[in-house]
Amino acid sequence: MLARLAIIGGILFIGATSTYAQQAGIERKMLLQKEGPPGYQTIVNVLEFAPGAREVRHTHPGALSGYVLEGTLTLEHEGRPTTAYKAGEAFYVDPGKIHVGMNDGAALLKFIATLVVEKDKPASSPAP
């Protein structure tokens, strides 16, 4: 029974942390995953969104900060107006807030996202 629960838990963790990987037009490459600060883990990804690509609504159990390398990121963030971030601009997503990133442009969107999230929790969870 415990083995089954461990397997199910692992599947749920993998599914929740691969929110981007399951969506058409979005590619994610993990650059770094490291424990720290205490009780947290730091994850750095580079993401590429094809024109028209859009994430599912989701949350993170910690802070997300990012930097747009190419294109324009349109970000819907719970409690804030929708904002477009162009190449060379940085953005921040509050812990636990529902948000959606999208590429409304005609060119590739590429950005770096750094998460500092609670250890042993999924890095990303679909929002209700």
Where are these regions (language model features)?
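Bacterial N-terminal signal peptides
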Residues: 4-16
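Sec/Tat signal peptide C-region and signal peptidase I cleavage site
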Residues: 17-23
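A short glycine-rich, His/Asp/Glu-containing loop-to-beta-strand
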Residues: 24-56, 114
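All-alpha RGS (Regulator of G-protein Signaling) helical domain and cognate RGS-like helical scaffolds
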Residues: 25-26, 83-86, 90-91, 122-128
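Short acidic-glycine-tyrosine-enriched beta hairpin
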Residues: 49-50, 79-96
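Histidine-centered metal-chelating micro-motifs
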Residues: 54-56, 74, 91, 95-102
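Glycine- and acidic-residue-biased ligand/ion/polar-headgroup-sensing regions
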Residues: 60-79, 89
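Ligand-binding loop in jelly-roll beta-barrel domains
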Residues: 96-121
